[in-house]
Regions:
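Glycine/small-residue-rich loop that forms an oxyanion/phosphate-binding "nest" at active or ligand-binding sites
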Residues: 77-111
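Binuclear metal-dependent phosphoesterase catalytic core
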Residues: 3, 8-11, 116, 210, ...
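Binuclear metal-dependent hydrolase catalytic cores centered on His/Asp/Glu-rich metal-binding motifs
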Residues: 116-169, 194-200
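Active-site environment of divalent metal-dependent phosphoester hydrolases
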Residues: 22-28, 48-52, 72-79, 129-133, ...
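Active-site-proximal segments of metal-dependent phosphoesterases and phosphodiesterases across multiple
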Residues: 7-11, 167-217
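N-terminal active-site segment of His-dependent metallophosphoesterases
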Residues: 1-66, 73-83, 303, 311
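Active-site neighborhood of phospho(di)ester-bond hydrolases with catalytic His/Asp-centered motifs
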Residues: 17-20, 40-46, 65-72, 108, ...
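Active-site-proximal beta-strand elements of phosphoester/diester hydrolases
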Residues: 12-22, 119-133, 170-174, 248-255, ...
């Protein structure tokens, strides 16, 4: 007896990546995400200088999400000069811990979060990263996670990969991995004096490499920290998307400021991705207006020979 078989089309997943927030998060941002119809939201951190109230608003967002903390999220705790400027009594309060408590399992720094309905796991890189070849200002990682070296950090990130429920893994970092170029305009290129150099995180790169050797499906590595507007020139902006020979999409989502105002009102930036069958087929930077419709869209990547619906 012959059976008629029909190929099942993979589910299209829509993901929003929110770049460095820097205190620019309002209720309207959540409404905008609802309007965009996303299945998952990824936050690359830097909500503000230990901005507990901003993190509280993000934590209340009722859309599946994952978050990693940035260097600004431990601004008054990670460095000696930051501690000198701390606006609160650190013997009585800990705003870093308050943020982590608000986020709970949603914070994936040195951790992971499984999304059964999407059949994927989000694995976080090193939280509170300042970027660069060394673990700069990393005492906070030693205090909170017992991590003191790049090798230990890579191993801890990799442990989350090994604990992932799903073969499809999205990596979420505050700063991106090393290996994406050493020009100042590259995704993690150093754009301050002395100009040039790879400022990516080597521990993040090593963990991704280990996951690749284990044949994990890695459609996306996304991060922020290195703002798109360059310090040394205004003639160009930073390269935002890199596609590796293996087909991994590396996305720097750090559009700063992510909320701007014009005569028509506010525009809110999101990076939108469409993923199908474990592959990113489209990446766009969009600005959403006060009517919660897309006011402008810039396509940053589209899979060759793929017809993709507008975001």
């Amino acid at each position: 007896m012959a059976f008629c078989s029909e190929k099942i089309k993979p589910k299209m997943i829509k993901i929003a990546v929110v770049g460095d927030v820097h205190d620019q998060w309002e209720e309207e941002d959540g409404i905008a995400l609802k309007s965009l119809g996303v299945d998952l939201v990824l936050f690359v951190g830097d909500f503000g200088n230990e901005s507990v109230d901003v993190v509280r608003r993000v934590a209340s967002l009722d859309i599946p999400k994952a978050v990693i903390m940035g260097n600004h999220d431990a601004w008054y705790s990670a460095t000696e000069w930051g501690r000198k400027k701390c606006p609160y009594d650190r013997t009585k309060e800990d705003w870093v811990q308050e943020q982590l408590d608000l986020l709970g399992d949603v914070h994936v720094g040195y951790s992971k979060l499984d999304f059964p309905t999407l059949n994927l796991t989000v694995v976080g890189g090193r939280p509170f990263s300042w970027g660069g070849p060394d673990m700069k200002f990393a005492d906070i990682c030693k205090q909170r996670y017992g991590i003191g070296t790049v090798e230990e950090s890579a191993d801890l990130i990799h442990a989350s990969v090994k604990g992932a429920m799903y073969e499809t893994i999205i990596f979420l970092g505050h700063n991106g991995p090393s290996g994406l170029g050493d020009r100042p305009e590259d995704p993690c290129g150093k754009d301050w004096h002395p100009i040039g150099g790879d400022f990516g995180d080597p521990d993040f790169a090593e963990a991704i490499s280990l996951a690749m050797t284990e044949n994990k499906v890695i459609p996306l590595v996304t991060f922020g920290h290195m703002h798109h507007t360059l310090r040394h020139t205004k003639q160009i902006i930073r390269k935002r998307v890199f596609r590796s020979p293996e087909g991994i999409i590396y996305l720097n989502a750090a559009t700063v400021p992510r909320v701007v105002e014009n005569v028509r009102g506010k525009l809110r930036n999101f990076s939108l991705l469409q993923m199908e069958g474990g592959v990113v087929v489209k990446v766009a930077s969009v600005w959403v207006g006060d009517d919660f419709n897309i006011a402008s869209e810039e396509v940053l990547y589209q899979q060759p020979d793929k017809v993709v619906q507008p975001v």
